[in-house]
Regions:
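A short beta-loop-alpha structural element at the N-terminal edge
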Residues: 9-23, 27
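Conserved GNAT acetyl-CoA-binding A-motif
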Residues: 122-124, 151-164
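Long, positively charged, glycine-interspersed low-complexity recognition regions
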Residues: 123-124, 145, 177-200
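Helix-loop element at the rim of GNAT/NAT acetyltransferase active sites that forms part
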Residues: 23-42, 56
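Conserved active-site alpha-helix within GNAT-family acetyltransferase domains
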Residues: 142, 154-155, 165-182, 188-189
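Conserved acetyl-CoA-binding loop-helix of GNAT-fold acetyltransferases
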Residues: 137-150, 174
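Conserved acyl-donor/pantetheine-binding loop and adjacent beta-alpha core of acyl/acetyltransferases
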Residues: 68-132, 136, 186-190
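Active-site rim helix/loop that mediates acceptor-substrate recognition in acyltransferases
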Residues: 42-65
Length: 200
């Protein structure tokens, strides 16, 4: 990616973008503590993550969320009106179980534990944001954050996210997020920081 100009302007992510979106996010999350826990094999993690994010995009967030991308990053947001719909259906659960293999049960427990701590007030949820490491530091993630946060601000609503990567907390804090609590996932999983940003 060195000599190629990659636009960091957010655009709506459509179905045809699925391969690129999945690739960017798999590269972004390959060293993420939670993804390392769900996909412990260094050898198979990149390919499984690509399938995982591709499935989430095409079968869940792309249908009921607000998905944006740049030329090297992607973000999945869920506005309050999409919250009840942006849950995996039976076929999506089957596909995710296949991708996760023997970690599927742990994954289900972790998702349920995190969901139990989600705010009850109407809010926007930042489900995923990530940039290809080869393009980090070039404003891709920040541009996607600004775009989604502007939508939430226009609606006068707070934004909620969870992160398992301590290195990312300062970036989120820069954008106005505050840690609400630190969660310990069942089954010896990594710490998960629940963060909230008040509307501006």
């Amino acid at each position: 990616m060195g000599g190629v100009h990659l636009s960091n302007t957010p655009v709506a992510a459509v179905t045809a973008d699925a391969p690129a979106v999945a690739r960017h996010l798999s590269r972004a999350f390959v060293d993420d503590p939670m993804m390392r826990w769900f996909f412990p094999s260094d050898e198979t993690r990149p390919e499984r993550l690509e399938r995982y994010f591709g499935t989430l995009f095409t079968r869940q967030y792309g249908l009921h969320g607000r998905c944006e991308r740049t030329d090297a990053a992607a973000a999945f947001w869920v506005p309050p009106e999409g919250a009840e719909k942006a849950v995996p259906d039976e076929e999506t659960v089957r596909l995710l179980r296949e991708i996760l293999g023997d970690r599927a049960e742990l994954f289900g427990e972790a998702v349920a534990a995190a969901a139990a701590h989600a705010p009850q007030e109407p809010h926007w949820y930042l489900a995923v944001v990530g940039a290809d490491p080869a393009a980090r530091g070039r404003g891709h993630g920040s541009a996607l954050l600004r775009s989604g946060l502007a939508e939430a601000d226009r609606a006068g609503l707070p934004v909620y996210l969870e992160s398992s990567k301590p290195d990312n907390l300062p970036l989120y804090e820069h954008f106005g997020f505050v840690v609400r609590e630190e969660l310990r996932l069942p089954g010896g999983g990594p710490a998960l920081w629940a963060m909230r940003r008040a509307p501006r």
